[in-house]
């Protein structure tokens, strides 16, 4: 028993619960191969759930040497799947990582999907993990500064399906001038609500509509919006398989979100030939503002400046045949090739096929 536990007992407090023992995985090649996604019930219906589904639906996992693909929703189910297996766990939310490591999940068997930095969320030593997946260049740079070695760090710009998302007709022939993408989440979820900046977004929608622009929002939950929206706004609640058709009817995709790891809508709009405007966060920060149909605004910009910039972007596309063509430029295409689900799944498969980096604490049945 540790000193802290003894002190608690001396002061009359109950002893802390015992930590579970370290999960004992098999040595490489001596047990069933498994890749397990750790997705708690709170992830269901959100982007991490969809990401795992799309990655595992690719042909990369179809051969007899591929690991078995499983999902665990709690620590106990995860431990039972890993025990005695040559297994890796893909932790899809960094907030789960410290508890899993404390509860006996071997660090060298963890691949962490790092979506974006979250203030106040402490992380253990990531250099102990088998791999860390970073969505964009900014997150990758932060992880390098934190000391994550290059052999463990991988760019993972997840992701889109090119069968659903591809270039459309010229911008002048498209139905919507401006599209905003994402579900509405009420102010009771303060962190998400603040990050997505719904008050600013709704103010901007009102200004754009007042200017006569055709504006749409793609996503669910907007009927419960707490802020006024113009009657002319078109609300589109469609399955994700239909999103590509909406992008191909759109001239410009806008996001006012204060922080993103992606978002996926940036990839989907980019490959659909849309103009893109956002804060310099996530994937957008990998591009120079004002080049190749991609623009950034400062975080402090208010709704009138966003409205003015959107109108300037639309005018620029009218004057530039390349921007207005609705076809991906070579620079966009190079970025997008690495973000296709098939490419990402192959990258994840190769990571699972790698030998463990450094020492391990696995058992040998010999």
Predicted regions and their residues:
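N-terminal pre-catalytic "stem/leader" segment of glycosyltransferase-like enzymes
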Residues: 1-92
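Acidic anion/phosphate-binding donor-loop and adjacent secondary structure
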Residues: 121-123, 159-175
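Conserved catalytic-core segment of nucleotide-activated headgroup transferases in glycan assembly
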Residues: 177-226
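Aromatic "clamp/platform" in nucleotide-sugar-dependent glycosyltransferases that forms part
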Residues: 258
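Short hydrophobic beta-strand element within catalytic cores of glycosyltransferases
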Residues: 275-278
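A charged, aromatic-enriched C-terminal amphipathic alpha-helix characteristic of glycosyltransferases
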Residues: 301, 305, 321-353
């Amino acid at each position: 028993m540790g000193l802290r536990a003894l002190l608690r007992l001396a002061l009359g407090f109950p002893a802390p619960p015992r930590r579970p023992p370290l999960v004992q995985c098999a040595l490489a090649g001596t047990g069933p191969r498994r890749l397990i996604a750790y997705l708690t019930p709170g992830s269901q219906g959100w982007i991490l759930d969809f990401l795992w589904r799309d990655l595992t639906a690719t042909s990369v996992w179809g051969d007899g040497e591929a690991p078995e693909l499983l999902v665990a929703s709690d620590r106990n189910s995860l431990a039972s799947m890993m025990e005695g297996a040559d297994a890796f766990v893909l932790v899809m939310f960094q907030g789960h990582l410290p508890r899993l490591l404390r509860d006996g999940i071997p660090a060298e068997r963890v691949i962490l999907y790092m979506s974006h930095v979250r203030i106040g969320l402490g992380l253990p030593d990531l250099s102990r993990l088998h791999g860390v997946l970073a969505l964009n260049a900014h997150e990758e740079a932060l992880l390098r500064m934190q000391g994550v070695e290059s052999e463990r760090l991988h760019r993972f710009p997840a992701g889109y399906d090119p069968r659903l998302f591809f270039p459309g007709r010229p911008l002048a022939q498209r139905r919507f001038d401006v599209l905003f993408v994402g579900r509405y989440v009420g102010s009771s979820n303060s962190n998400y609500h603040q990050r997505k900046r719904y008050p600013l977004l709704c103010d901007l929608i009102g200004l754009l509509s007042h200017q006569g622009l055709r504006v749409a929002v793609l996503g669910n939950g907007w009927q419960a919006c707490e802020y006024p929206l113009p009657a002319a706004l078109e609300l589109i609640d469609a399955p994700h398989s239909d999103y590509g058709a909406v992008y191909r009817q759109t001239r410009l995709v806008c996001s006012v979100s204060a922080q993103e790891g992606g978002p996926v809508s940036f990839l989907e709009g980019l490959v659909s030939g849309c103009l893109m405007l956002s804060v310099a966060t996530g994937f957008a920060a990998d591009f120079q503002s004002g080049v190749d149909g991609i623009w950034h605004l400062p975080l402090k910009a208010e709704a009138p400046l966003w409205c003015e910039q959107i109108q300037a972007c639309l005018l620029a596309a009218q004057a530039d045949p390349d921007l207005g063509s609705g076809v991906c430029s070579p620079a966009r295409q190079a970025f997008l090739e690495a973000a296709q689900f098939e490419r990402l799944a192959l990258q994840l498969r190769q990571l699972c096929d790698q030998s463990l980096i450094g020492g391990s604490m696995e058992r040998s049945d010999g």
